Design a protein with these regions (language model features):
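Conserved N-terminal helical subregion
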Residues: 20-127, 131-146, 181-195
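Glycine-rich FAD pyrophosphate-binding loop
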Residues: 1-15
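Residue-level marker for buried hydrophobic side chains located in beta-strands
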Residues: 1-4, 112, 232, 236-239
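Flavin-dependent oxidoreductases
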Residues: 138-166
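Short, glycine/acidic-enriched loop or turn micro-motifs at the edges of active sites
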Residues: 8, 119, 238, 244, ...
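C-terminal helical "tail/cap" subdomain of flavin- and related membrane-associated enzymes
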Residues: 38, 207, 229, 250-251, ...
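FAD/FMN-dependent oxidoreductases across multiple families
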Residues: 158-160, 168-169, 178-250, 256
Length: 326
């Protein structure tokens, strides 16, 4: 087994990830669940508010924990990657080893797994440009600031939102999204633009904006992936964003990648040969992940509406009552 990573080193900084119960079960199956629990934190309840601070809805994380027997855990992305890398056999991980032509790997390995992200080279080898990325209608900013906030949550305005999650002692993960046409020019000063868009919103949003540093802001357009007809072909499989890149609105991208990986391992263990295992994996994972991706796209559109805000708020409360994917 070889894990090829294009970066020369694992990251030391990065935003926080919410690990939902299903993903934590996957980490338990990999033998690293307790380490992630130890190095992360339990997510406290949060609210979704309007810019004036009035509450639209409350996220009942205790109900989720009662239902699934596991809370949502928050862990920094570099921590999760370090834990996963530490569980590999020493020689398995090859850094600074990008895959440029996955076809050549098929001659050297029994199985090629493309876990190479939204711009997957392996997916392009399988499908070309037949299933392109789709612009989700919004631009996002995100980062981490040196602030200690006990509770996270989101605030929804007209066509824009701002979110916060604790990211460990003295650290807070923040993100913002604004509905904009594709290719909209980037502002010359992201901090000034964020202050213009969100500076008069309820506390602690202005405090977070004041803590921003120019090199601590990431800006990107939000895309997801046109649904694929299959995640497998021959002895090649796709997982995670390579298979079902989704918008971040349900916080499920990393979680579903972890569940994919364990499902693929289970199918390989139980099936008689690799092609049969991959067909079983595709049956097991494609429909659930594409359903979640569609839900994330819908949630992003809902949070970004500019009109009929009372209808938006009522739909949000109904969606929360039904419960998020766990």
């Amino acid at each position: 087994m070889t894990v090829r990573e294009r970066s020369a080193a694992l990251p030391h900084t990065g935003t926080g990830l919410g690990i939902w119960p299903g993903a934590m079960r996957a980490l338990d199956a990999l033998g690293v669940g307790d380490e992630v629990r130890r190095r992360g934190s339990r997510q406290a309840g949060g609210s979704i508010r309007r810019p004036d601070g009035s509450r639209i809805a409350t996220v009942d994380v205790e109900r989720l924990e009662r239902r699934h027997g596991e809370p949502v855990h928050l862990v920094a992305r570099p921590v999760l990657l370090a834990v996963l890398a530490g569980a590999l056999p020493g020689p398995a991980l090859r850094l600074d080893a990008p895959v440029t032509g996955p076809g050549s790997l098929r001659d050297a390995y029994d199985l090629v797994v493309g876990a190479d992200g939204i711009n997957s080279v392996v997916r392009a080898q399988m499908y070309g440009q037949r299933y392109p990325l789709r612009y989700a209608g919004a631009v996002a900013w995100r980062g981490v600031v040196d602030l200690d906030l006990a509770e996270g949550g989101e605030t929804w305005g007209r066509g824009r939102k701002f979110g916060l999650t604790p990211a460990g002692p003295g650290r807070t993960n923040w993100y913002a999204a604004v509905r904009l046409p594709e290719g909209h020019p980037a502002p010359p000063d992201d901090r000034a633009e964020l202050r213009r868009l969100f500076g008069d919103w309820h506390p602690p949003v202005p405090r977070v904006l004041d803590a921003l540093t120019p090199d601590g802001i990431l800006r990107h357009e939000i895309h997801d992936l046109t649904p694929l007809p299959s995640y497998v072909a021959g002895r090649t499989a796709l997982l995670g964003d390579a298979a079902h890149a989704m918008t971040p609105d349900l916080g499920q991208g990393a979680c579903q990648a972890l569940i994919d990986a364990v499902a693929l391992a289970d199918c390989l263990r139980d099936a008689g040969d690799v092609p049969a295992a991959l067909r079983a994996y595709d049956r097991r994972r494609r429909r659930p992940t594409q359903r979640i991706a569609a839900g994330a796209r819908w949630a992003g559109r809902l949070s970004g509406v500019r009109r009929l805000l009372p209808v938006r708020d009522a739909l949000l409360r109904l969606a929360l009552a039904a419960g998020p994917p766990a």
